[in-house]
Amino acid sequence: MAAAPSHPAGLPCSPGPGSPPPPGGSDLQSLPPLLPQIPAPGSGVSFHIQIGLTREFVLLPAASELAHVKQLACSIVDQKFPECGFYGLYDKILLFKHDPTSANLLQLVRSAADIQEGDLVEVVLSASATFEDFQIRPHALTVHSYRAPAFCDHCGEMLFGLVRQGLKCDGCGLNYHKRCAFSIPNNCSGARKRRLSSTSLASGHSVRLGSSESLPCTAEELSRSTTDLLPRRPPSSSSSSSSSSFYTGRPIELDKMLMSKVKVPHTFLIHSYTRPTVCQACKKLLKGLFRQGLQCKDCKFNCHKRCATRVPNDCLGEALINGDVPMEEAADYSEADKSSLSDELEDSGVIPGSHAENALHASEEEEGEGGKAQSSLGYIPLMRVVQSVRHTTRKSSTTLREGWVVHYSNKDTLRKRHYWRLDCKCITLFQNNTTNRYYKEIPLSEILAVEPAQNFSLVPPGTNPHCFEIITANVTYFVGETPGGAPGGPSGQGTEAARGWETAIRQALMPVILQDAPSAPGHTPHRQASLSISVSNSQIQENVDIATVYQIFPDEVLGSGQFGVVYGGKHRKTGRDVAVKVIDKLRFPTKQESQLRNEVAILQSLRHPGIVNLECMFETPEKVFVVMEKLHGDMLEMILSSEKGRLPERLTKFLITQILVALRHLHFKNIVHCDLKPENVLLASADPFPQVKLCDFGFARIIGEKSFRRSVVGTPAYLAPEVLLNQGYNRSLDMWSVGVIMYVSLSGTFPFNEDEDINDQIQNAAFMYPASPWSHISSGAIDLINNLLQVKMRKRYSVDKSLSHPWLQEYQTWLDLRELEGKMGERYITHESDDARWDQFVSERHGTPAEGDLGGACLPQDHEMQGLAERISIL
């Protein structure tokens, strides 16, 4: 309900026909309220105020201002149309006087003097009123004693106590805890205070509208009735003896800020409630002793499991009490804070729509990775960071084949015997047939070929040859053993057993993502495709099979991670290359799927050349497919493929500037990437100076400018210390990651040793920047890295401050970026205002080469750039 003017007292009211005139205008307030008076001559101007189909006969005192009339109009709206009022109504209305003699019937009232006796004044809503204004209607909360059990309409929990258990809104009648008052959105409907538009404000009788049929109201009545509708304020010390306490909801400015936030699906987890709680979707009690319902991990929304699918995607992120703290209250790091990470997530089941547990430990083992010798300083060489997973798994419900198998590989010629279990996604090598602990997983998506035995060079002397080979990108597995035990026996040997495994694996390598899921005996198999959502044109189609729109290549794996596998594909009609991210609901129940949903919800709200484009999404009962544009490679491949294992400064400036521009767009939308690393910076082409785009928003969070979060996210090697120390973080988290990316791009190593304190390492310049290779890198680059790798968040550079750093404000970089914008046909990195500055820079430096000759200004790096371009084109 709208906050009406705070000074309604003294507002005039309309006289009624036949009422005796008062002795003077000053005595109007002293008369009984039930005896309204007709004003004496000279005491004011009487006229009608019309709002829609409602008219009120009012009196404007002499020497009144236009503000007086607006206050009166707001009071009428608050009483007769409370559901139409909103915060700031006074500043959003215009007054027009009806003038039948003019060609323009409505004349704008600019001052109170424009209103004459008997005029009809129309109240019109200004065009400056926005949709957000209509959504802000503060509650009028008073302490209330309930005679029957009641529940809070904000958190769903029961209002406990014998008397004065909670707060009731006088406008809409909803009930709240006192502790929830600050969190209550200003969305009062005003249903309890609404009056019929045909009812006069001064009378309880219903009357028909007429030119003078409305009974007048005294100023005292109008003041009292209007005050009843205003949001309450806490009583002052002078009124401490009052029997009622008054409360207001959360600040209006907070509501305006929250309306601009991107809304995402709720993160539901199964929850056990210790207090009686109602479902906030259906308003019915959550019954049971434990695991009664679902609770959103971020906003604490409660609902039944059956109601989860009907809950709108309107989560605004973590509530203030659950992690967002004002920036000025955030403390710097102390030794006491450096404790081990605590696991925030429950071990209970998770339902669709929930975010996955974020693994934050280094990989426990990597078969096939050659150990690179570290330098004497103990620097960690740059590599693709692999998130660790617990080496346990549940038995798949779609097991295709299982049994004991003997095997060895080209990396390890020692024969091993494990219990293999093949399902539709991978081959799992278990320690035995009764445990869920496994030795290794071989994803089917990584198997390039299954060939008969042909390479016998690695067969140990005196042993039997293998039966067939499983070839992956890094490892070749030699499976089976020709003579020996019975087929399929516990020894894992035998030609027949090996032949059966070879056939089963070949069948599993077929495009299973396009096949129908195996159905139970007696059940009719159903179609995979059920729903298609097009992001580009917002079209939703049912019963659309993804195979009819896109050709997916299961053997073209573009990447894999915690959130699924990305396959290459092609649009059937246009031949356009695409990337398809797949989540298997059956194998990965809701964890990775929920992160994917969060990524889709965020990408739907983003349209920027520096962010990967989301085309559409398909969902089936078993899988979720997200179709995105296919890019050439990632920034990590570019770094690793360079001749020296690091990038030249010129190219690093070019790439970092693009990353910062994309981050600026994200932060403007209050979105923090939270997992920025070279693997998530994709290259659009094989050019030596390519366009880059940010991807993988599975960890992304919606964080306000002065808000903090505490959820554990991201990849440890690129994470800021506030996350690793389980403290609140904000959008500066991404800026730390940019500093790490700069460091690894210029040096080819990670900046920190995980065994030593980050503070000590940063303060030790000799450790952070050894002579090789940093003696060949400019001091400007080191200065920018130092300002990004600040442990104290308030000292860390922002996006705009980083873009303004002298190291990035370089003429050659500007030329490279302008050339890229010319190829793209869109100017989104540089700005027109920079043109004059750089033109002046060229004119002042007469020795500066022309634009076409600037490529020769960096001769030491040109050889590197040429070699790098050749390697990128091969990737």
Swiss-Prot record:
User: Which stretches make up the PH domain?
Assistant: 398-510
Modifications made to the protein after synthesis: Phosphorylation of Ser-873 correlates with the activation status of the kinase. Ser-707 is probably phosphorylated by PKC. Phosphorylation at Ser-244 by CSNK1D and CSNK1E promotes nuclear localization and substrate targeting. Phosphorylation at Ser-244, Ser-707 and Ser-711 is required for nuclear localization. Phosphorylated at Tyr-438 by ABL1 in response to oxidative stress. Phosphorylated at Tyr-718 by ABL1 specifically in response to oxidative stress; requires prior phosphorylation at Ser-707 or/and Ser-711.
The short motif Important for ABL1-mediated Tyr-718 phosphorylation is annotated over 725-727
User: Which InterPro entries does this one have?
Assistant: C1-like_sf (IPR046349), DAG/PE-bd (IPR020454), Kinase-like_dom_sf (IPR011009), PE/DAG-bd (IPR002219), PH-like_dom_sf (IPR011993), PH_domain (IPR001849), Prot_kinase_dom (IPR000719), Protein_kinase_ATP_BS (IPR017441)
- Fetch the SMART domains from UniProt: C1, PH, S_TKc
- Annotated active site: D675
Region (Disordered) location: 1-33, 224-247
User: Which cofactors does the annotated protein need, by name?
Assistant: Mg(2+)
GO biological process terms on file: adaptive immune response; angiogenesis; cell adhesion; cellular response to vascular endothelial growth factor stimulus; intracellular signal transduction; phospholipase C-activating G protein-coupled receptor signaling pathway; positive regulation of angiogenesis; positive regulation of blood vessel endothelial cell migration
Q: Describe, by residue range, where the zinc fingers (Phorbol-ester/DAG-type) fall in the chain.
A: 138-188, 265-315
Q: What is its EC number?
A: 2.7.11.13
Q: Which domain of life is it from?
A: Eukaryota
- Write out the residues that bind ATP: L558, G559, S560, G561, Q562, F563, G564, V565, V566, K581
Q: Which reaction does it catalyse?
A: L-seryl-[protein] + ATP = O-phospho-L-seryl-[protein] + ADP + H(+); L-threonyl-[protein] + ATP = O-phospho-L-threonyl-[protein] + ADP + H(+)
Q: What is this protein called?
A: Serine/threonine-protein kinase D2
Q: What lineage is on file?
A: Eukaryota, Metazoa, Chordata, Craniata, Vertebrata
